């Protein structure tokens, strides 16, 4: 819950029984956008931190920060990290063992693979295929980074399993197709060492997806005027 700054646990069985009281696993004090638990009793955070992109928080390590948002050159590096991060928002997804995760950016073809240990985050791979065009607006009290409508949307969603990473790719711009730019027909599958495995070309654009633990089935939300749940196996 971003507004309450809480990470809560939702039990589907209890929800079906009408119980909507969710236990709080962690209360975030860092203004994170997303939080994922790790197998080491710590929490990985993604946010517009002052100088960094990720945080790692736990009783035995406190709060530590890692890496910064991408930049194409020295000039873009001078843009404040919190402001630059608004142009490089994306999807964070971890494997079931909670010791590896992927961060894929929506506004540009950039993704990174990471591993988590007891007190550190290590980047194992990064792919950079381009950078977004955007403006920066910072009044001191408000900040934003409006994007160019000509930007080609890249990795709309990411999903991770024990063996593989999956990236949903758009390749379209808002200028060309409007909000359909936030859907994609291509899913790239790669191993955690970044070895390409497969490229799935779907028959119709999808807006979101997940993959079975055995990696043999893809479930997707398809927008055909009405949203449909589809299965690929």
Name each model-derived stretch.
Residues 2-3:
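Conserved small/polar residues in nucleotide/adenosyl-binding loops
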Residues 10-17, 114-131, 232-233:
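Short loop/turn segments immediately following beta-strands, especially the blade-tip
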Residues 20-30, 62-87, 122-150, 203-204:
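Surface-exposed loop and turn segments in beta-propeller and other repeat-based domains
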Residues 32-40, 82-105, 150-161, 210-214:
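Structural signature of eukaryotic scaffold interfaces centered on beta-propeller domains
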Residues 210, 216-233:
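Blade-level signature of beta-propeller repeat domains, shared across WD40, Kelch, NHL, RCC1
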